[in-house]
C-alpha cells in the first residue's frame, strides 16, 4: 500500500450534482483547495465552503479558463438521459481539454455500461468491453478519447463503480424507482431479487477518488480502477431498506416489457430498457487492483449507508 501523496487544487466540473458535491466535500475534508464549477441556477446545491465558479459547461473556453492552475480536474458532469447522445462526448472533450491545458490529472467516473448484456459475473480491469446499448457505446468512446489523450501526456484516472446511491439530491435508482412508493408501503425493484447487483455508496466512491488523487504520480498515465462497493442481491438490498425503516414492504417490479414498448414514443424509457440487463445479469466488481493502490477500499456498511441515504431523502424510520 502506497502512502499519501500530494494534495493541491481540484476543480470539480458539475459541482452541484450528486457525485460532484460528494467529491467536493471529500476533497475539502482531506485538506484540498476545492472549486465547484456549476451553472448559476444550481450554485446553491454545491458543497458549502468550496469556491463556486459559475460557468456553463457547454462553453469550452470558459471551462478551460476556470480550471487554470488546477492540479486535478474531476469530470462529474451529469448529462440528462435525453441529451446524452448530443452532449456527452462534447462535454467529455471539454474536460479533457481543460485538464490538458492546466497539466492536471483528469478523474472520470466510469460505470458498467461498457460491458454490455454479455457481461461476466466478475469484472476487473482486464475485462473486455462489448457494449450493447447506446450509452455503453458512448462510454467506450469517451474512455477511448481519454486513453488517446493519455498517450499524448494527459494523466487520467477512471474510477469504475456500480450504480450510485446516497448523497445529497435525487437522481439514483434508489430514489427514482425503488423507494418511490415507500410512503404507501411499497418498494419497486428493477430485477429478480436473487440477482447480484453492484452498488456504490457515493461517499465511499468520493473517498476513493481522494486517495487516488493523492497517489496520482504513482499511477500509469491512463489508470482504470474498479471500485468494489456493495455487490448484493435485490433481496439483500430491500431487506436493508426494511431494517432501516423498521417495517416490511410489499415488493413490486419494474415492468420492463411495457417500458420497452413505450420506448418507441418515450425516449427516456428506450434508454432505460437498453441497460435493463444490468438488473437481470449477476455481476460484481473485483477491487483487487484498487486495494493494491490505496489499501482497504472505503465501504460503509450497507445498513448504515441505506439509513443515511433514506435520511438524505427525507424518509424517516419508524420509532
Model-derived regions: residue spans:
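Mid/C-terminal beta-alpha module of Rossmann-like enzyme folds, strongest
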Residues: 2-10, 17, 211-272, 287, ...
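NAD(P)H-binding glycine-rich loop region in Rossmannoid oxidoreductase-like domains
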Residues: 41-102
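Conserved beta-loop-beta element that borders a ligand/cofactor-binding pocket
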Residues: 111, 144-168
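NAD(P)-dependent short-chain dehydrogenase/reductase
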Residues: 152, 162-196, 241
Amino acid at each position: 500500500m502506497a502512502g499519501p501523496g500530494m494534495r493541491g487544487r481540484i476543480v470539480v466540473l458539475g459541482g452541484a450534482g450528486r457525485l460532484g458535491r460528494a467529491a467536493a466535500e471529500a476533497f475539502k475534508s482531506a485538506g484540498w483547495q476545492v472549486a465547484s464549477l456549476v451553472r448559476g441556477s444550481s450554485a446553491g446545491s454545491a458543497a458549502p465552503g468550496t469556491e463556486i465558479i459559475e460557468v456553463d459547461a457547454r462553453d469550452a473556453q470558459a471551462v478551460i479558463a476556470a480550471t487554470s492552475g488546477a492540479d486535478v480536474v474531476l469530470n462529474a458532469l451529469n448529462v440528462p438521459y435525453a441529451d446524452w447522445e448530443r452532449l456527452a462526448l462534447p462535454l467529455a472533450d471539454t474536460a479533457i481539454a481543460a485538464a490538458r491545458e492546466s497539466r492536471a490529472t483528469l478523474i472520470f467516473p466510469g460505470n458498467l455500461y461498457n460491458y454490455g448484456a454479455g457481461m461476466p459475473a466478475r469484472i476487473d480491469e482486464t475485462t473486455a468491453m462489448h457494449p450493447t446499448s447506446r450509452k455503453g457505446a458512448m462510454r467506450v468512446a469517451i474512455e477511448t478519447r481519454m486513453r488517446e489523450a493519455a498517450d499524448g501526456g494527459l494523466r487520467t484516472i477512471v474510477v469504475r463503480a456500480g450504480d450510485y446511491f446516497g448523497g445529497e439530491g435525487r437522481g439514483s435508482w434508489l430514489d427514482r424507482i425503488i423507494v418511490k412508493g415507500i410512503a404507501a408501503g411499497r418498494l419497486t425493484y428493477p430485477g429478480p431479487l436473487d440477482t447480484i447487483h453492484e452498488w456504490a455508496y457515493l461517499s465511499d466512491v468520493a473517498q476513493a477518488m481522494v486517495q487516488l488523487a493523492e497517489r496520482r504520480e504513482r499511477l500509469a498515465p491512463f489508470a482504470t480502477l474498479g471500485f468494489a462497493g456493495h455487490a448484493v442481491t435485490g433481496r439483500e438490498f430491500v431487506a436493508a431498506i426494511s431494517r432501516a425503516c423498521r417495517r416490511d414492504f410489499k415488493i413490486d417490479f419494474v415492468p420492463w416489457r411495457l417500458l420497452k414498448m413505450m420506448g418507441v414514443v418515450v425516449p427516456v424509457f428506450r434508454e432505460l430498457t437498453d441497460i435493463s440487463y444490468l438488473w437481470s445479469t449477476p455481476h460484481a466488481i473485483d477491487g483487487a487492483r484498487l486495494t493494491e493502490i490505496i489499501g482497504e477500499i472505503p465501504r460503509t456498511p450497507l445498513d448504515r449507508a441505506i439509513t443515511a441515504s433514506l435520511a438524505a431523502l427525507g424518509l424517516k424510520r419508524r420509532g
